[in-house]
Amino acid sequence: MKTKHILMATALASLSLMTTSCGSDFLDKAPSGNYTAPTFYSSDKAVMKGVEPLYNKAWFNFNRRALIGMGSFRANDGWNPYVSAEFANFKVTALTEDLSLAWSALYNVVTMSNATLANLEQYCTNDVTPSVKNAAEGECYLMRGWAYFYLLRGWGDNILFEDNNKLVQNPNQPLNTEADVLKFIIRDFRKAEQLLPETGTDHHASKYAAKAALAKALLAQSGWEEGSTTDHQRNEATLQEVKNLCDEVINSGQYSLMNNYEDLFKAQNNDNSETVLAMRWADPNSGEWGAMNATYSDLAFPEVTDVNVWGGNLSPSCDMLDYYNEDPADSIRRNATWFTPNTYYSYIKKSDGGYTY
């Protein structure tokens, strides 16, 4: 019995020490080694860095594999019997992993955009230049709009939300109609256009990236909106706005077509005159998983890279090759987009003098 009393007394003593140690001063410790929202947004540089995950990590599980399957494979440009084959074979179901990863990634972009907008509004100090804050907010609206644009075209009706906290408190939200989702997208792109600068810096978007996105969304709306079209005719007023926006982008002086189509795919032209808006990924050899571009794994094959890849079974579709072969001059595009037998590529394995497939 004495032993039990001693053990109980020791336990109670320990509990009292634990209880008295947990005062408010003990709990209110500033994290060491990590940034926190209340103190992070204190300079122009920090604000610009704060939106950069919207150019990579937020999109990772959409860009990694689903984008190719939902895009090129479903469009019958090509296919791989071992990777995302169900998109080419029209066997996609609600349980298809790439599809669910894409859906969650796109909503990740939405929630990250919402959180960044809230942080910018709440925590930006007076040391942040108003134009820099506006640009960062514009990027959030632009990325959220693009995420919803992909969600709309992939899933139709979707859940719209701008406040993450409200969604957490009440996660049971109704679906919004396609027409309403498209209106939301267009509203976001218009806000982005108003807030973004004339010229982007350090790979950040300019207002012309928003104008281009807005033109694309309005083009969709011109034939989508109920009551505005009859007999499959598009809304002419909307089409005129699309034309005006495209003219503004083209005549901005910031973009131009490259002379050689093949040059688009060369590493040294990663940022070129045709780039309006692009994701920004870390080096696949040294970058953090989730912040680097992992599409190379599915698209490349071991013979042409020192990175771990498995794209050797990727092939163009017969229809794709037929389109290229209709015009012999189109071998320029064919050779640039697909490795063609007996074709020499001077920009592949340059240290070895090039590569012949």
Language model features with spans:
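Flexible, solvent-exposed coil segments and beta strand-coil junctions
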Residues: S32, V92-T93, N165-L167
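An aromatic- and glycine-enriched ligand-binding surface/loop that stacks and positions planar moieties
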Residues: C22-S84, R190-K191, H204-Y357
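Conserved, well-structured interaction surfaces
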Residues: Y41-N63, W79-W155, N170-K183, R187-D202
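Short coil/linker segments at helix-helix boundaries
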Residues: D157-A179, W224-K243
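Bacterial Sec-dependent N-terminal signal peptides
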Residues: M1-S32
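A short secondary-structure junction motif
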Residues: L120-Y123, G154-F161, A192, Q221, ...
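Glycine- and aromatic-rich loop/turn segments at beta-sheet edges
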Residues: I159-N164, L195-H203, S256-E262
